[in-house]
Amino acid sequence: MPELPEVEVTRRGIEPYVSGRKVERVDVRTPALRWPIPADLAKTLRGHVVRKVERRGKYLLFEIDAGWFIVHLGMTGTLRVLRHVPHPPAAAKHDHIDWIFDEFILRYRDPRRFGAVLWHPREAGDVLEHPLLASLGVEPFSPAFSGALMHRLTRGRKVSVKQALLAGEIVVGVGNIYASESLFRAGIRPTTAAGRVSLVRYELLADAVRVTLAAAIEKGGSTLRDFVGSNGESGYFQLDYFVYDRAGLPCRVCGTPIKQIVQGQRSTYFCPTCQR
């Protein structure tokens, strides 16, 4: 599943091609993804200029004067920029939506169809008030995110520190891959109860989250199966993983075999020596 780095890489890749450009047409080939695609989406967007593309957590927010269309990539979704002059590229089986601009097509592809394309009209209020966005935690690169915040919001909680990271109620966008990697950098065992992690260690974790996500964005995200950026190229942060998907391999720091366990039906990877 694309996590925050992959979504941010996508945003940075598509924004220069769509911001300030008019949507000439929208071709919707699939009536529903995770939820139904608004029936009048094509009519609503046609002729409007995209003001900017922002990200909130794992959601992409495309602003036009009438409101915002919201895109979530789900498990296998990608957005690619394709040149349609002189000849538009043919759509393949899993290419569900095209936003057509003067020279380019923004194409949404999603083999498993767990993604979403939604509409939030301006009269409904700010897009951040949308039900899917209103309860999200803070952005990891914002000044509001800190070890003190995590420490305060986890007091008395028995859930594991990894599951607290994944929940998205404290900080957004830290999925399974980057939770494992961040906990390794911070030296915290993922099974530790969130309420038992000290303020000092949470400060280390906050720094580790920022460093890990920034490094992943710099390297185009992670491509384990489906993800490609807006130009069709794979990310390569997976080459730098310390623990994720490295079960049985030696720790890059101490040489101890990396251990794999299951938490909340998801695989967790950690070093038994470096993480305590």
From Swiss-Prot:
Catalytic residues, chain numbering: 2-3, 58, 266
MF terms in GO: 8-oxo-7,8-dihydroguanine DNA N-glycosylase activity; class I DNA-(apurinic or apyrimidinic site) endonuclease activity; damaged DNA binding; zinc ion binding
Cofactor dependence: Zn(2+)
CDD domains noted in UniProt: EcFpg-like_N (cd08966)
Catalytic activity: Hydrolysis of DNA containing ring-opened 7-methylguanine residues, releasing 2,6-diamino-4-hydroxy-5-(N-methyl)formamidopyrimidine; 2'-deoxyribonucleotide-(2'-deoxyribose 5'-phosphate)-2'-deoxyribonucleotide-DNA = a 3'-end 2'-deoxyribonucleotide-(2,3-dehydro-2,3-deoxyribose 5'-phosphate)-DNA + a 5'-end 5'-phospho-2'-deoxyribonucleoside-DNA + H(+)
GO biological process terms held by the UniProt record: base-excision repair
InterPro entries associated with the record: DNA_glyclase/AP_lyase_DNA-bd, DNA_glyclase_Znf_dom_DNA_BS, Formamido-pyr_DNA_Glyclase, FPG_cat, MutM-like_N-ter, Ribosomal_uS13-like_H2TH, Znf_DNA_glyclase/AP_lyase, Znf_FPG/IleRS
SMART domains, A to Z: Fapy_DNA_glyco (SM00898), H2TH (SM01232)
Highest taxon above the source species: Bacteria
Residues noted as binding DNA in the record, renumbered to the chain: 94, 112, 157
One Pfam family, short name: zf-FPG_IleRS
SUPFAM superfamilies xrefs: Glucocorticoid receptor-like (DNA-binding domain) (SSF57716), N-terminal domain of MutM-like DNA repair proteins (SSF81624), S13-like H2TH domain (SSF46946)
Record-listed E.C. numbers: 3.2.2.23, 4.2.99.18
Cofactor note: Binds 1 zinc ion per subunit.
Zn finger region (FPG-type): 242-276
Keyword terms: DNA damage, DNA repair, DNA-binding, Glycosidase, Hydrolase, Lyase, Metal-binding, Multifunctional enzyme, Zinc, Zinc-finger
Family: Belongs to the FPG family.
Function: Involved in base excision repair of DNA damaged by oxidation or by mutagenic agents. Acts as a DNA glycosylase that recognizes and removes damaged bases. Has a preference for oxidized purines, such as 7,8-dihydro-8-oxoguanine (8-oxoG). Has AP (apurinic/apyrimidinic) lyase activity and introduces nicks in the DNA strand. Cleaves the DNA backbone by beta-delta elimination to generate a single-strand break at the site of the removed base with both 3'- and 5'-phosphates.
Subunit structure of this chain's protein: Monomer.
Protein name according to UniProt: Formamidopyrimidine-DNA glycosylase
Gene expressing this chain: mutM
